[in-house]
Amino acid sequence: MTNDIKVVIEELLFYAGKNLDMYEEDYILRRNNLLDLLKVDAPADAPVDNCRPLQEILDDVNEYAAENHLAEEWEKINFETRVMGLLMPMPFQVITTFEQLAASDPALAMKYLYNLSVNSNYIRKVDIDKNIGWKVANPRGDIMITINLSKPEKDPKAILAAKNAPQTAYPKCMLCKECVGFSGNAARPARQTLRTIPIILNNEVWHFQFSPYVYFENHCIALSDEHRPMHIDADTFERMFDFVELFPDYFIGSNADLPIVGGSILSHDHYQGGSKVLPEMSAPSKKFFTHSSFENVKVSIVDWYNSVIRLEGKDRKEVKELAAHILKCWREYSDKNVDISAKTRNEPHNTVTPIARFNDENHYVIDMILRNNRTDKAHPFGIFHPTEDLHNIKKEGIGIIEALGLFILPGRLSSEAHGIRDILTGKTPLDFKALSDESNPLSKHIGMIAQLANDFGTSLTEEEAATRVTDYINDACVRILDCTAVFKHDEKGEQAFDRFMTYCGF
């Protein structure tokens, strides 16, 4: 390592003083903590009066740690987090500052916590900025696509270490409040830089934090104090409206509470939100309804890919009660003409993905995306799940973020798309035998490659090949959203949607 570790430590202290609310009285303690962690016997002769960008400093720390056998290469991010954790303000200080700011300006409080999350490297912005994203124009609504390059593939040594590590049930999951300060291990990320804010939602303690993955602007999470399964009911809508009243510039939504149509974590009740207007929220209404018991609520079907009912009104209680009524009706609703069955024996299939916010008129809004997770022999992954020919692009469940029109695609797709382009330009011969080998990273795309080669040949220019591959991905994402619609965009589906609205009393 070319830089003196003692000077690197002083750079970290200088950075924390400028960016992590570190008080003058904290410097000696923080310096000694860093000296202890890095096994350095004494500090530099003098503090520094400037520092390099944080990641450059941390790269030096990691190099030093590897040279001195303080951490394995695969432990790099966890070790960085441990270092930064020694420089973080304590939870009480963060909560106090946040609440003082929120008392006069909630937006300023949110900005404070977000900046702290970035400055502490909890949100790894240097990595997140590597993500590739673009907008797709479509007559039924624009969508956004991101290829997630910020999440590195797991190192084989890390996988082996996780397999051999003692199994622990602490914390119970990565959304539990006990994750604040958690040291991490081979199987779980370190969270010494995580800070959460307690908030009251429907008379319960919940905890607010920003997501480390930042899939969209100010991507945040609200999680229940208790480790309990995801569940959507009338209380969900109360909590969501409490949240948007606390933070009026934000939306909040919940993944569905059933497998296949829910998110990746169903074991811990939580919501996701942010300040960005995601594509579905901008979609117009295409058909309006009235209900004699809820005359002051504007009700409509949204002109969007999946099946969405939008409720808007000044009266919070009335909007919430109508949402609860629709949820109750949907939970028990079946229509075999369009493959909707509420239950198989005692297993429920119908649920919703709800999203709450204020509109431009400052009215309460809930968008309810109707979901159904039933499977059958012809659709083993789900009747309203992406069909198997789309699994090379997206096989996982379609959660709230994708349902709202923002696709987060795996980082592997970037290199795989490049490989497909090479076939379309003729750089790589089209060899179906080689593509059929499951060890070939392009094997999952064999159908896509066959279609593109048949339609456009294998003598395209680089630009033409890139366009064809991107167009294919764009079309696949549109089709994926269409798959999730419980009422399809044809005459049969629209009539079925009307029957459900009639069932609800509209």
Q: In which residue ranges do the predicted regions lie?
A:
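Helical scaffold of the NTase/Pol beta-like nucleotidyltransferase catalytic core
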Residues: Q192-I197, D225-I252
